[in-house]
């Protein structure tokens, strides 16, 4: 076959393959154009998830008949000139979207320029047969896309179900709406309104807060910290959830660069690192975080859909984001998720309240009580035997309680109003500490709470190089399940020595331990080494020092903490609560579960019909 020049329509269809993958891609490109046009109101109408019909209407600046004619040509744009390529502030700039969409659909554009008397429309079928005619229309633009991919039926076969395609489109609209709380959005599918968001006219922070409530939910705002960082060429703002308010997937993570939604690996890794001390690896925080950066320091032209970016100094951006999130979390470091308490209140609700008493039948005193089945909160990871801490609970000897908890408190009895977590009143099932504040009761998981306290204390010891070694009178020989675990411990022995653990290889599958951290006291060395070996084996051979420290600290803290089933005196319970009040991130254990639940008195009174 001889070399030949492709036709314009073929070129546009090829270009469409890079830019337009599904109906959501069409909606993204057209809504972004509407935003760039200065719209204050954008309406989206879909039929069959956009496969049959997509209509985007806006009240933006609009177009004249001459602008309409060239707008559907390749590489025509009002947003860019040759001298301004490194200073891009708009969503679109390549001039590819309209001709690419037109090449694979039946398109009708109707538009009226602001302050113009006349409106015009242009009709294209598969990118050809351009027809411009006068029309009747308000100021702004309306674009109708029918029979998407009719010109490329092979692409049509690759589309997913209507439900899946619709979900992708809703996600696109939500992201753009979050970035522009000043714009009103509506999304209708097959005659049903899915989204209706009113544009906000408040200050910037309150605009964003209200839009987040409308899109993500009020629960998120109640369980989130506000991020606010500013420098001459960089700023970060938004909301990120406290560690105990989390999800099983990353779907509710919204990241923006200069108001452009992105799925950037660098930012996602930074988010994960910021939470690594406070959350299980299979749980994800919720966030809506906006990075504003000088356009000359970020390249948005590295991906066909502009979903990825390239930073001039990626490490600077990464570290700045991590620090900003950690600073925001520290402002609410003692708080546990409010949804946990709400779920607990639901458990106590009496199904017979406000109902007529059933007096027609005598009470059967011999009937068996119904089984109590507690509900599971969707934000709390289920207890699983795979977590080393949970496996330890039944096998650990009595762990040493740190000196502050052991000391007797000689002061007068503590009053409920003195402290945020209140005064201890009782211990339930030798596992939960019940305390009372002025307007609530607090239920604390003693093992989870002390594990967090130990984690923070050991972490500080390691950071400040204050971890003291304790030589074992009789070195402990630990036999491991396989040679791999013994090897990985031995290969990291120098790093482990700095963390208070001295060991040597002893045969193919065994390790001999000569020193342990003094803070751990009289612990089960066999179990400590086996758990540590399991942790490191999961990470592979080339484990980084920071990750090693994380695993070691986590393992130490678990062995160090008060176990469930340990009876505590009133002084010990109060000492534990006071330590929690003075320790960062004591609202959640090392796995992201809450260490305490607070039940407000007003909610308890409502349960009994008092209010």
UniProtKB/Swiss-Prot annotation:
Entries under SUPFAM superfamilies matching the protein: ATPase domain of HSP90 chaperone/DNA topoisomerase II/histidine kinase, DNA mismatch repair protein MutL, Ribosomal protein S5 domain 2-like
Keywords attached to this entry: DNA damage, DNA repair
Domain of life, per lineage: Bacteria
MF terms (GO), sorted A to Z: ATP binding; ATP hydrolysis activity; ATP-dependent DNA damage sensor activity; mismatched DNA binding
Record Pfam families: DNA_mis_repair, HATPase_c_3, MutL_C
Disulphide-bonded residues: none
GO BP annotations listed: mismatch repair
InterPro entries tied to this protein: DNA_mismatch_repair_CS (IPR014762), DNA_mismatch_repair_MutL (IPR020667), DNA_mismatch_S5_2-like (IPR013507), HATPase_C_sf (IPR036890), MutL/Mlh/PMS (IPR002099), MutL/Mlh/Pms-like (IPR038973), MutL_C (IPR014790), MutL_C_dimsub (IPR042120)
Region (Disordered): 364-384
One GO cellular component, as annotated: mismatch repair complex
Physiological role: This protein is involved in the repair of mismatches in DNA. It is required for dam-dependent methyl-directed DNA mismatch repair. May act as a 'molecular matchmaker', a protein that promotes the formation of a stable complex between two or more DNA-binding proteins in an ATP-dependent manner without itself being part of a final effector complex.
NCBIfam families hit by this protein: mutl, PRK00095.2-2, PRK00095.2-4
Family from the record: Belongs to the DNA mismatch repair MutL/HexB family.
Protein name, entry field: DNA mismatch repair protein MutL
Gene, per the UniProt record: mutL
């Amino acid at each position: 076959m001889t070399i030949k020049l492709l036709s314009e329509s073929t070129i546009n269809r090829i270009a469409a393959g890079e830019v337009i993958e599904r109906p959501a891609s069409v909606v993204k490109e057209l809504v972004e154009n509407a935003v760039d046009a200065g719209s204050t109101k954008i309406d989206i109408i879909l039929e069959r998830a956009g496969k049959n019909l997509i209509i985007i209407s806006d009240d933006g600046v609009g177009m004249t008949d001459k602008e309409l004619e060239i707008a559907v040509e390749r590489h025509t744009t009002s947003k860019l000139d040759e001298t301004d390529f490194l200073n891009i502030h708009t969503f679109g700039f390549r001039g590819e979207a309209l001709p690419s969409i037109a090449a694979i659909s039946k398109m009708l554009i109707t538009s009226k320029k602001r302050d113009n008397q006349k409106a015009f429309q242009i009709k294209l079928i598969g990118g050809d047969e351009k027809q411009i005619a006068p029309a009747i229309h308000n100021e702004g633009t309306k674009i109708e896309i029918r029979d998407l991919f009719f010109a490329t039926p092979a692409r049509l076969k690759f589309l997913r179900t209507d439900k899946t395609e619709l979900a992708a489109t809703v996600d696109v609209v939500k992201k753009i709406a979050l970035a522009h709380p000043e714009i009103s959005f509506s999304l209708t599918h097959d005659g049903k309104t899915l989204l209706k968001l009113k544009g906000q006219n408040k200050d910037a922070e309150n605009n964003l807060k209200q839009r987040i409530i409308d899109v993500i939910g009020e629960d998120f705002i109640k369980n989130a910290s506000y991020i606010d960082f500013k420098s001459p060429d960089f700023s970060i703002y938004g909301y990120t959830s406290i560690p105990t308010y989390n999800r099983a997937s990353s779907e509710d993570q919204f990241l923006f660069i200069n108001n452009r939604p992105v799925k950037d690996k660098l930012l996602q890794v930074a988010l994960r690192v910021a939470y690594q001390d406070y959350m299980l690896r299979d749980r994800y925080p919720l966030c809506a975080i906006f990075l504003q950066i000088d356009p000359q320091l970020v390249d948005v032209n590295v991906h066909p859909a502009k979903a990825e970016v390239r930073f001039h100094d990626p490490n600077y951006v990464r570290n700045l984001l991590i620090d900003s999130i950690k600073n925001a979390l520290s402002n609410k470091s003692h708080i546990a998720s409010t949804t946990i308490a709400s779920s607990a209140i639901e458990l106590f609700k009496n199904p017979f309240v406000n109902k007529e008493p059933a007096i027609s039948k005598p009470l059967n005193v011999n009937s068996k009580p119904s089984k109590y089945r507690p509900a599971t909160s969707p934000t709390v990871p289920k207890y699983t035997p795979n977590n080393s801490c949970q496996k330890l609970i039944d096998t650990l000897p009595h762990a040493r309680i740190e000196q502050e908890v052991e000391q007797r408190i000689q002061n007068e009895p503590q009053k409920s109003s003195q402290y945020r977590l209140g005064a201890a009143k009782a211990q339930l099932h030798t596992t939960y500490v019940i305390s009372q504040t002025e307007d609530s009761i607090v239920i604390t998981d003693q093992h989870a709470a002390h594990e967090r306290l130990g984690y923070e204390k050991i972490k500080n010891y390691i950071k400040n190089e204050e971890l003291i070694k304790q030589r074992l009178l009789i070195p402990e020989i630990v036999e491991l399940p396989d040679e791999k675990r013994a090897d990985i411990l031995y290969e990291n022995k120098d790093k482990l020595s700095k963390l208070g653990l001295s060991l040597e290889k002893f045969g193919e599958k065994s390790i001999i331990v000569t020193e342990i951290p003094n803070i751990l006291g009289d612990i089960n060395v066999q179990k400590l080494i086996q758990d540590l070996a399991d942790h490191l084996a999961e990470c592979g051979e080339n484990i980084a020092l920071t990750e090693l420290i994380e695993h070691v600290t986590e393992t130490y803290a678990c062995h160090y903490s008060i176990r469930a089933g340990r009876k505590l005196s009133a002084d010990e319970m109060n000492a534990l609560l006071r330590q929690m009040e003075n320790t960062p991130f004591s609202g959640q254990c090392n796995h992201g579960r809450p260490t305490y639940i607070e039940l407000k008195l007003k909610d308890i009174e409502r349960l009994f019909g008092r209010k």
